[in-house]
């Protein structure tokens, strides 16, 4: 019988922006090679937690964090420097944000930053990453054209390829399909499910149907708290907290 392994452990995490208590005693075990969805109304702390995992909140003035986030047993705030962490944890944002450079250079950007400059090695990384992002066949003949000429859906898959190029352990996705049309959304969802074979994925989504379609576990956030965390099928079919039931049935949110 296979045993699940916690890749990320969030323990007694509190986060303040000045006097505002944005995350309240959050405790989550995020398991390896699973898709974990964060759902909840706007402003409930989903994206704040995502940004805490890869320390994007380091740049926010008056942000104070207590508690622990560990990645494979290492504290991301006390034991990993920011460059180590960013190599282990990739991030894909809500709006596609390709760099104003070629498709090739977008994907090669991270590996170059981490010291890889061999053309042969970069060629292999770019091809592998674009294939993983289901984009290679669409762009292999125009790798040196600007990424800004791609469609929105292609740009988002390019951003996924760029994140994968550094071979992270964890991929964080902050509403990656909210700016896309339904066809592009379906492609991204299919891609995310495929990526689960090799990566631990955490996705923030406002689309509850999306959480049902792609995630193994779901955490429901409300006013900075994790109200409920369970297997997705159980959380949506038999919620244990009345607030979860009210949210997923559309009574608020």
UniProtKB/Swiss-Prot annotation:
Domain ABC transporter: 8-248
Coarse class of the protein's main subcellular location: membrane
Top-rank lineage group of the source organism: Bacteria
Catalytic activity: phosphate(out) + ATP + H2O = ADP + 2 phosphate(in) + H(+)
Keywords noted in UniProt: ATP-binding, Cell membrane, Membrane, Nucleotide-binding, Phosphate transport, Translocase, Transport
Pfam families xref list: ABC_tran (PF00005)
Binding sites annotated in the UniProt record for ATP: 40-47
Enzyme nomenclature, EC number: 7.3.2.1
Subcellular location: Cell membrane
Gene3D superfamilies found in the cross-reference section: P-loop containing nucleotide triphosphate hydrolases
PROSITE patterns reported for this sequence: ABC_TRANSPORTER_1 (PS00211), ABC_TRANSPORTER_2 (PS50893), PSTB (PS51238)
Bilayer topology term: Peripheral membrane protein
SMART domains assigned to the protein according to its UniProt record, in alphabetical order: AAA
GO cellular component, one term: plasma membrane
GO MF, one example: ATP hydrolysis activity
BP GO terms, sorted: phosphate ion transmembrane transport
Keyword Glycoprotein among record annotations: no
Record note on quaternary structure: The complex is composed of two ATP-binding proteins (PstB), two transmembrane proteins (PstC and PstA) and a solute-binding protein (PstS).
Function: Part of the ABC transporter complex PstSACB involved in phosphate import. Responsible for energy coupling to the transport system.
Family recorded in the similarity comment: Belongs to the ABC transporter superfamily. Phosphate importer (TC 3.A.1.7) family.
Protein name: Phosphate import ATP-binding protein PstB 3
Gene symbol of the encoding locus: pstB3
